Structures are given as C-alpha cells and as structure tokens.
A protein has these predicted regions:
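Hydrophobic/aromatic residues located in beta-strands of well-ordered beta-sheets
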Residues: 27, 54-56, 159
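Conserved S-adenosyl-L-methionine
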Residues: 31
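Conserved SAM-binding loop of SAM-dependent methyltransferases across substrates and taxa
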Residues: 36-48
C-alpha cells in the first residue's frame, strides 16, 4: 500500500539514516500484524546495506498474527503489490496460491508480542514504522504513543506513519514533518 510512501522511504529516508548512523540501523515495526511490513522493509533495506546488518524488531499484541508472520507464508494477493524483483528474489511458490518468504529475509526480522498501550518500548531506534493502526486509537492514546515513540527514537531518527495518520501537535513532541509527494 502507498507506493509513494515506500519510494520516499527507499530514496530519501533510508539513505539519510544510513549516512547519519551507518548500515546497522535499529528498526522497529510496531503493530506489524502478519509481517508484511517488516518483511517488505527488510527487502528495501537489503538494497541499501548488507543483509547481515539488517535487524528489525517487529511487534504486535495478537499472538495468532505473530505466528502467521513467523511462518512467512502469504497468498498471492498479499505479494502482488510488491515489486517483481522482490517476488522473484525473496519468495518461493508453494502450491497454486501461496508463497513462502526466504529464510534470508526471515532472519532479518525478530517478532515479539507487545501492546503499544501497556508494554515498554524499545529504545535507541533509528526508524520506527507504525502505519494504519493509530487511526483506531483515541486522541489521548495517540498522544501517549507518539510521546513514547519520540523517546524511543534517537535524535534525528524517523517515525514513519501511514498517510491516513496525522500527528496533531507534532512539534510539541519534537517531530519534524516530512511529506511524501505523489509520483507519477
């Protein structure tokens, strides 16, 4: 979803973070659901840095979706939006309609159970990806989560959210707004 945002991540944000912090970025995919996002992130990072340097922490509160994420098996609808190069390089066909993600990519992602409203957050993160979940939170809960994300990030780190999410009062929690532009 949102190819323009992923393009901005790949072409602008990641090169900036790598130039500031080196190839071993600490990346957290919060509310990762079935793992589509952290695995996609690992594939994008693999274009920029050696795979051995990629370590993504991926959290969700639902143990069942985390088990699905760890399995790394997806239907063709889940992978059809990925670039062909990623489909060919990182997926193995299983039967007629399913694809298994490569072990190389699976090794880049560590899945853990975590509740954004209750559990401690990782610290020292260079990049936090949290898309399309906070829209379901109350304004008070969003404010709390954004403040905790800010404390989890290193100075000049990046919080990457979905284009449906607005951080009201982002300056109050020391965020600088970067907008991804639609590309044709």
């Amino acid at each position: 979803r949102n190819p323009n945002l992923w393009k901005t991540l790949e072409d602008v944000i990641l090169p900036d973070l790598i130039s500031k912090f080196g190839p071993r970025l600490k990346v957290w995919s919060a509310a990762c659901s079935t793992g589509d996002e952290p695995y996609s992130l690992a594939m994008v990072l693999a274009k920029k840095v050696p795979m051995r340097d990629i370590k993504i922490i991926a959290t969700d509160l639902d143990e069942q979706v985390l088990e699905k994420a760890k399995d790394g098996v997806y239907g063709e609808n889940s992978i059809k939006g990925l670039p062909k190069e990623f489909q060919d390089k990182y997926f193995e066909k299983m039967g007629d309609r399913f694809y298994k993600i490569s072990d190389d990519i699976k090794r880049c992602v560590e899945f853990k159970k975590s509740n954004l409203l209750k559990d401690p957050y990782p610290t020292g993160c260079h990049l936090i990806v949290c898309r399309n979940v906070l829209i379901y939170f109350t304004e008070e809960a969003k404010k709390d989560v954004y403040e905790k994300f800010n404390k989890s990030l290193v100075t000049d780190g990046c919080l990457f959210v979905g284009n449906t999410e607005q951080i009201i009062g982002y300056r109050a929690v020391s965020y600088t707004h970067l907008r991804a532009h639609e590309t044709t």
